[in-house]
Amino acid sequence: MHHLRALVGVGLAGLAAGVPLTDKISVKPRQAPGAQNVVYWGQNGGGTIENNDLAAYCQPNSGIDVLVLAFLYQFGNGGNIPSGTIGQSCYISTSGQGQNCEALTAAIHTCQSAGVKIVLSLGGATSSYSLQTQAQAEQIGQYLWDSYGNSGNKTVQRPFGSNFVNGFDFDIEVNGGSSQYYQYMIAKLRANFASDKSNTYLITGAPQCPIPEPNMGVIISNSVFDHLYVQFYNNNNYTVPCALGINGNAPFNYNNWTSFIADTPSAGAKIFIGVPASPLASTGTPSGAQYYAAPEQLAAIVGEYRSDAHFGGIMMWSAGFSDANVNDGCTYAQQAKSILVNGAPCPSSGPPSSTPATAPAPTATTMPSSTSVSSPTASPTGGTVPQWGQCGGEGYSGPTQCVPPYQCVKQGDWWSSCR
């Protein structure tokens, strides 16, 4: 992924109080069957900031099935405790302590209660991670389980308290000669997954689309992945170029990926079509707009491959870019969900629900002919919403007050954002 945000310093105030663990617990399974919509959350760029309230993306009409928390981007290199910044507030130190992570911890519980899976990602487009030995990889894998899994371990730092994630993602974009060791980290995680019979966990990866894949090819060839969020963008100029095959870009090599994994331990993995969520998303600048698929283009691509046995759905980078890209009253994430559910982008009536059993019924309000500014009531949950963040919409129950000088702008019955 394109890792753009500035790293948060270690001096952030307010250590997250770890909630003591008791017995192992279970989380609510995903409610809607079929192809899934996966969105990365927690890193920003291109002048775009996602809503810092993760729970805002777990509303019934958000269109999101899996949220990937990005990133733990520092590990190895002499330190065996992964650290990083997730969102605008939560910092995980090199000692494993969570700082200012209370709100994220509460949101994780809210999202999982709504049936949205939460996956924790390692890596990103930074050079602050590497592995030197098999033993180190296994040690880090065990630590990840103890600190973020349903381990029952009370002796380690747990940044999210008693909450645990639904899996671990590997967005390895730096090789450094250490790719051969990740298989041991993944194997250690899977061995621990087997100890928790009450829950199902995911191992996911976000490889670049070229084959051979320069950074994750060896990892995929020696590990069992459940989901592969292939980045079909930013690779027009690679030795073996690939992209979505639109806008004059390199060919779409989805079929090459199904052939590649057939002879690996990941032969049963689901392949997700990874896309930028706005014209700025792939590089953080207008230069990456060529890789962006408009909703109609994305619908055509998905329509061609959705019957493939390996097809898993859509992955997008990232939540903030999706929020800033509203068409027909729908964010890009909502457009993607409509494509997966209905085979077409959002109609003017608004986005489909990821959880139909609890979705609010749409009102008979007519869509406005032009953008209007709403007058939000006081937020029941408090807090402020950054530029482009969601501040209203049918069924939305998150914060409604925008950071000054922005106003909550209604763009459809289902979506209002701070602009």
Curated annotation (Swiss-Prot):
SMART domains: fCBD. Residues 35-343 form the GH18 domain. Gene3D superfamilies: Glycosidases. Its main location: secreted. Residues 343-390 are annotated as: Disordered. InterPro entries: CBD_sf, Cellulose-bd_dom_fun, Cts1-like, Glyco_hydro18_cat, Glyco_hydro_18_chit_AS, Glycoside_hydrolase_SF, Glycosyl_Hydrlase18_Chitinase. Residues 1-18 form the signal peptide. This is Endochitinase 2. It comes from Metarhizium anisopliae (Entomophthora anisopliae). The gene is chi2.
